Amino acid sequence: LHPNDEKRIIRALEVYQATGKTITQHDRESRAIPDRYAPLTIALNFRERPWLWERIDRRVDQMMAQGLEGEVRGLLAQGIPSTCTAMQAIGYKELAAAILTGRPVREGAEEVKLRSRQYAKRQLTWFRRNKEAHWIEWEREPDFSAAVQDSTRLVHASGLQ
């Protein structure tokens, strides 16, 4: 562990306090346990990327309409520092920064949209690297019923129960 990696140091101390083992021992022992289940990765993708971005934008607008700004303001008013791990989540971090610097909250919301799109892109890239992932592709509107049927078919075809 790097001495400046506060989050991992805290996690290592939590593991030691809970188990009496160092994080290295815990990780080594965890890897030595044989997997009881074979993983089956099912990934969902929209072929039309701009449509995914529109869905993300609509979701952020919905979160704002449901009171995300008030929630962030409330947490800050309670003295929760903006550097707290929970306040680093997408949405909280950007709105807290806008509020604390006096920028318009609307700018913070636009930044939430940008960060959410960047995160979605990283997720898709991560899944694409998994050569064993089974992809369910949507043109535009998600067809959840078809996705459930496709997923069920993949599970049965893989031999999983």
Regions picked out by a protein language model, each given a short descriptive name:
Residues 32-161:
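Catalytic core of IPPT-family isopentenyl/dimethylallyl transferases
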